[in-house]
């Protein structure tokens, strides 16, 4: 069968990578070696003495034969010398001269091979030189024979719109630069998002996600999957956001009360000669991790069950089926294991930096990281509509990437808009709130108690994850506040970090061990560590004169002595449950990351209660 070849026009000088020398971030992250699939397709054969001998120079006869096989030319099997019919075919096309036909064991230079290939229907990129190795020729031929599709992908950006060099986050302006480079490099390009985009920082939350619509609409996304946190402002607001996007928001496993899909379930596009269908999924735990009022009347079904039904249907309508999922890598693996026919799953939700793609049951699984710390890239190579090559990974934060001026302007407009909105009053405190460094890192404070209590109150709305205790690292509390009105800006100065509320199961022994870490440096008056914990739902007594690790004398949870063997539900933040500040005992395999920042939680609590008057209640007592 005759193939329609794509144009390849540049004869390179030096290595292939020099085409994109202007950027260190262009080109596939892991170049695909074409000789593997070309050998499987019997385009290239080994020698009798074994091996492909790719280091040898390619002869005229070999080059013509490889082109003929690769392009599907109708060349009769030779009866005598193996190259005769290939040479006759090339001569009939005007690609080689009569003298060349008679001297197939010559070794043409790169420019001559390029001219021959062009006459035979395709153009090659070859390193310039008097001779070309078999390896270089096969690689160039593979590039010309395949349709190369590049996909950039993001997930769980959570409103981190600005560059943050301290936490190594690109921000959208620098992501835009990478996207533009990749799009210019390969016309067969898609940018996709796997959800949790509109919620997470003050820059998104203050306007229920609408503030960043101009940024997203300027980046050129193809489609996005709805993440669980897209529901945090209520599903009606989700639909409002969807309607203002210039690209579709897809989901196939959320249903309205009348049995119809809440969102369009799929997105189909043609790129690189492939008709690709994307199916969107969100975690079925969404009704647990968002407020129940946000999803009233909605049903969240198991993505595996939906995939079993929908993938075969989409394969009838498209060449390839991809999944755009916000269900976490474990569930992605489950889909791949149980449903055949999926080329690629672009995932999110579990914040898993898949630097190396996974392969399960023939399905590639990728996931970008979180908060714009990286940009995912996938390169797929198709031959005769078969996937024959794959490369994937992450381009992680690099300060040297330049910010795109257009997107940077849009980002700064959002920042300015939010700064103006931060003057709004959200509550009132009848007492001074004590959050100075020397207090929150050394003793119980009324502000620490207020924050811990707000966190416990929030968990009471998350069915099955109601916390017994709350642990707040003092280093995360950054300011005090005089009695009076509390504005958004006041609260943000107290809780400026985007740490999110996490919930974990821990034994009484784990909790006591955490308290030992909390008080291990409490006597360091001039260098107090931020690991000191403000607490809720519990109390304890410690003795600073005791050795480190033996200072906690008495612990009570809910007024009762702690049971070392009992499992308790602990609410804290993602920094602590990742083992930060030495809290390795709280780094568990199963952690619920709610996605709510401490700022979000405390603001909501304050808006509900309106007036606060927190006190010190002997939750933390030093034995004198």
Q: What role is predicted for each listed range?
A:
Residues 1-146:
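N-terminal propeptides
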Residues 66, 115, 140, 178, ...:
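Generic alpha-helical secondary-structure signal
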Residues 67-71, 152-163, 426-438, 493, ...:
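Acidic/histidine-rich, surface-exposed loop or edge segments in extracytoplasmic proteins
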Residues 80-89, 194-199, 474, 478:
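Acidic helix-start/capping segments at beta-turn-to-alpha-helix junctions
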Residues 88, 150, 160, 170, ...:
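Feature captures C-terminal
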Residues 146-402, 409, 442-457, 463-470, ...:
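Acidic, metal/ion-coordinating pockets
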Residues 405-486:
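Hard-cation-handling environments
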